[in-house]
A protein has these predicted regions:
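The serine-hydrolase catalytic nucleophile loop
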Residues: 41-54, 215
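Conserved alpha/beta-hydrolase
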Residues: 54-76
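Catalytic nucleophile-loop/oxyanion-hole region of alpha/beta-hydrolase
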Residues: 73-98
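Short beta-strand immediately N-terminal to the catalytic nucleophile in serine-hydrolase-like folds
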Residues: 105-107, 135
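Gly/Ala-rich beta-loop-alpha elbow adjacent to hydrolase catalytic centers
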Residues: 107-115
Length: 265
């Protein structure tokens, strides 16, 4: 059974210089731990993977929350004003309000980075998630996969004009890379820091991912020496991992993690 989209009203955020806004979400009732979907950069909660995972949770009687960040999908906003800090705040707001006890966070691409940042914040509050599924986790992507790889002329355009419109492999329309996006994200970089997440992590990665290369993810995994980490590699998988066989693997991994967490509790 489908779940209707609802809107969560948020007040003016003077710190982020945001007007009052609404975040769109779909919250499926069911058993704990809830599965919470954290989408990727410029993706939304109606994506193939998010929808398939919601359908699997419906079959299992499992609670599932998915939502759109500010200026994504059904959540209104000016993408030029959006930053990683805003999207992290959105995720934390949703998890705190609707996540229930010890949810499982499923983060795709940028959502993987946000899942890690959110976990650190939630642990400090004594309400950590019970596990993470990370799909092609784009940790520190704004700095290492964007800024560090941009030619000098593009960097200068971003610094001078405040924005550069990047051609998209997934859309006919280019999308804005803003100076505020790059500079704000620097306070959230974690790859050069000791990382100890403290909950089980399962990573799903395509070996032929051109956007978040497997070598990049291997580097991230090597920094998680103190954590319980599993990794499933799809040899011919790309970044999206949205083929039926990829979706089946994601659903299986998520179900297995939930089952193992329930057995251990």
């Amino acid at each position: 059974m489908s779940v209707e989209t609802q809107l969560l009203g948020l007040p003016v955020d003077a710190r982020r210089q945001l007007p009052a806004r609404q975040l769109a979400y779909r919250n499926r009732a069911g058993d704990a731990p809830a599965v919470i979907w954290l989408g990727g950069f410029r993706s939304d909660m109606s994506s193939t993977k998010a929808t398939a995972l919601d359908e699997a949770c419906a079959e299992d009687g499992r609670a599932m929350l998915r939502f759109d960040y500010y200026a994504h999908g059904e959540s209104a906003g000016d993408f030029h004003a959006a930053t990683l800090s805003i999207w992290l705040d959105d995720a934390l707001e949703m998890i705190r309000r609707f996540g229930g006890p010890a949810p499982v966070l499923v983060g795709s691409s940028m959502g993987g980075w946000i899942a890690l940042l959110a976990t650190a914040r939630l642990k400090a509050e004594g309400r950590a998630p019970s596990g993470l599924v990370l799909i092609a986790p784009a940790v520190d992507f704004t700095e290492r996969l964007m800024w560090a790889r941009f030619p000098e002329e593009i960097r200068q355009k971003i610094l001078k004009d405040g924005v550069w419109y990047r051609p998209s492999a997934y859309s006919p329309e280019p999308y804005p890379i803003t100076r505020s996006l790059i500079e704000d994200a620097r306070q959230h970089l974690i790859l050069d820091l000791p990382i100890h997440v403290g909950v089980p992590i399962h990573i799903l990665q395509g070996a032929k991912d051109p956007d978040v290369p497997i070598q990049y993810v291997d580097q991230f995994v090597s920094s998680l020496s103190k954590d319980d980490v599993s990794m499933t590699i799809i040899p011919d998988g790309d970044h999206r991992l949205s083929r039926p066989e990829d979706i089946a693997t994601l659903v299986r991994i998520t179900r297995e993690l939930v089952q193992s967490l329930r057995a251990a509790s």
